[in-house]
Amino acid sequence: MFPFKVSKWMGLACLRSLVLPSPSIRQKKLIHKLQEEKAFREEMKIFHEKIEDFREEIWEFRGKIRAFRGQILGFWEEERPFWEEEKIFWKEEKTFWEMEKSFREEEKTFWKKYRTFWKEDKAFWREDNALWERDRNLLQEDKALWEEEKALWVEERALLAEEKALWEDKKSLWEEENALWEEEKALWVEGGGFHLLGEQRHQNGPYNANEEPQSTSFPRGRA
């Protein structure tokens, strides 16, 4: 009875471990998430470098503006070369603003990706916390099952000890019964069974089918 109960509890614990996700799946998800975060931070680092390069372009362009203003103040006489330089300047300015437009588009895409990443990151850690809480509850349930199983094992061990004591008592009774049987047999042989028949006829009653008296003083049994 008790081994069956213990086996049933152990079977339930094994079935629970097969149905529920193992800790290795959660660990793989964590590793994959950390790799994605590392790649995203590398991309963020590259984008910061682009921002610094763009700032350098801005300062360089401001220097050109100041130089151009100086040329306006110093070379009014040389109007034609000035207009040629102005034409070149406006071309450079157009290129600069196109570069800025491209940069703003890239920045917009980056921040969109950034928001998506943090939304996914938040959802991931929420799911991870739920898995961790479930694993913790399962560990507590497993601990309770093991404690109950341990109690069953202790109870079964006590029952086995009692059963062993009963077998020892029964064995002792069998040994006493065999000793009495041997003693009765010896008395029967040494005292002369036929001599005792007449004396035991009136005491023990009629003979049985094997011509032996019905003895009531000694039990006859075997171990």
From Swiss-Prot:
UniProt region (Disordered), positions on chain: 199-223
A cellular component term, taken from the record's GO annotations: plasma membrane
Domain of life, per lineage: Eukaryota
Residue runs in coiled coils: 129-153
Keyword Coiled coil annotated: yes
Keywords: Coiled coil
Protein name: Coiled-coil domain-containing protein 70
Source species: Mus musculus (Mouse)
Designated gene of the protein: Ccdc70
